[in-house]
Amino acid sequence: MKLETKAQGLRGSLRIPGDKSISHRSIMFGSLAKGVTTVRDILRGEDVLSTMQVFRDLGVTIEDDGDVVRIHGVGFDGLKAPQNKLDMGNSGTSIRLISGVLAGQDFDVEMFGDDSLSKRPMDRVTIPLRQMGVEVSGQTDRDLPPLKMHGSKSLKPIHYELPVASAQVKSALIFAALQADGESVIIEKEKTRNHTEDMIQQFGGQLQVEGKEIRISGGQTFTAQEVVVPGDISSAAFWLVAGLVVPNSKIVLKNVGINETRTGVIDVIKDMGGKIKLSDIDQVAKSATITVETSELKGTEIGGDIIPRLIDELPIITLLATQAQGKTVIRDAEELKVKETDRIQVVADALNAMGADIVPTEDGMIITGKTPLHGAEVNTFGDHRIGMMTAIAALLVQDGEVDLQRAEAINTSYPSFFSDLEGLLHG
């Protein structure tokens, strides 16, 4: 598709679609609780719809009237063997977390996904699950999907140090540990997003978190809850950057989730000199209104323990860095290579094709700015965040057209992205 270029300014306010991580987990915990859980402001992107369908296939009744999602929970012991293979679509969150849920189920399942998901390594989940007594096998020595699995009603507790900083792996092991005989200990490499831990407590469960160590006992039960999903900061990040780099812009984003394990992008924007303000802060819901406006930006260094707090925002942060004076160095981000695409290479290739100066490295990128951008053809390779990054980059293009291939990937996490963009262009 041909993208909008030569933006004269973005102005207006937006309510960001629901957080993808919390939307996935609300369906999972609602299914595993006893009673009817209601979820408002859920994200209806393709990934979350995949999770919803998988739990229906496992025997859970889920109603969606377009406003509220009602989940008739069955508990861990009420899940039923599916009639068919479980389709995870493009969703790494779905296949990894649901592997943990199914670890304690005494039936056969096969989980598969699209071409992109079929290239993502699952060994980081399958290795510890095997240690707990799960039979699971994938393709190649990295256990690529499809995965065949048979869980166990007598899961062994685990003491496990995560070799990578991954909220998905951590969450998969937490779901398995909730079904194990005894106490499990999971030790993170770096602190990652903690929505799973938060929701265990919200649904009446217990766990202990001390620093990077999580202790969790098996045999717990959950009680249905009312969940309101805040806006997704990963989706908001595209508008935060757009408001900073497009001339004559001021954007107000309402009800954005500001869980402290997810706000690295805000820290980086402040560090680069961006004009950003948080207001209407709700400490209970962990949400706020965020306002940004066009800013003069400077390069920075991004690495270490901030990386898990902004891993999904690094593509759009890279675009931000192309519009900052000086050099920006991103390091310790090798996890980008096993996302929907190799995001180090694909981001660098896409923005360099548009005139940026980006050198990919083993674990990140070196970006030299400020560079004007020009038209090019860019392929998302099925990666939603590459698509949205390119659409924001196109707004800065004064010369030529930007042709985005496979733009439909954006529906994975933000189906209303282009209509929201139109609103800001005419705000």
Swiss-Prot record:
What metabolic or biological pathway is this protein involved in?
Answer: Metabolic intermediate biosynthesis; chorismate biosynthesis; chorismate from D-erythrose 4-phosphate and phosphoenolpyruvate: step 6/7
Compartments, as annotated in UniProt: Cytoplasm
Keywords associated with the record? Amino-acid biosynthesis, Aromatic amino acid biosynthesis, Cytoplasm, Transferase
Active site location: D312
User: Which cysteine pairs are joined by S-S bonds?
Assistant: none
The record's annotation in SUPFAM superfamilies points to: EPT/RTPC-like
One GO molecular-function entry? 3-phosphoshikimate 1-carboxyvinyltransferase activity
Specify the signal sequence span: none
Q: Does the keyword RNA-binding apply?
A: no
Which CDD domains does the entry link to? EPSP_synthase
What are the binding positions for 3-phosphoshikimate in this chain?
K20, S21, R25, S166, Q168, D312, K339
- InterPro entries, per the entry: Enolpyruvate_Tfrase_dom (IPR001986), Enolpyruvate_Tfrase_sf (IPR036968), EPSP_synthase (IPR006264), EPSP_synthase_CS (IPR023193), RNA3'P_cycl/enolpyr_Trfase_a/b (IPR013792)
Q: So where does phosphoenolpyruvate get bound?
A: K20, G92, R120, Q168, R343, R385
Q: Name one Pfam family in it.
A: EPSP_synthase
Q: Name one GO cellular component term.
A: cytoplasm
- Tell whether Amino-acid biosynthesis is among the UniProt keywords: yes
Query: What enzyme class is recorded for this protein?
Result: transferase
Function description: Catalyzes the transfer of the enolpyruvyl moiety of phosphoenolpyruvate (PEP) to the 5-hydroxyl of shikimate-3-phosphate (S3P) to produce enolpyruvyl shikimate-3-phosphate and inorganic phosphate.
Similarity comment: Belongs to the EPSP synthase family.
Q: Which PANTHER family match?
A: AROM/DEHYDROQUINATE SYNTHASE, PENTAFUNCTIONAL AROM POLYPEPTIDE
Assembly behavior: Monomer.
- Specify the protein name: 3-phosphoshikimate 1-carboxyvinyltransferase
Q: Which organism does this sequence originate in?
A: Streptococcus thermophilus (strain ATCC BAA-250 / LMG 18311)
Gene transcribed to yield this protein:
aroA
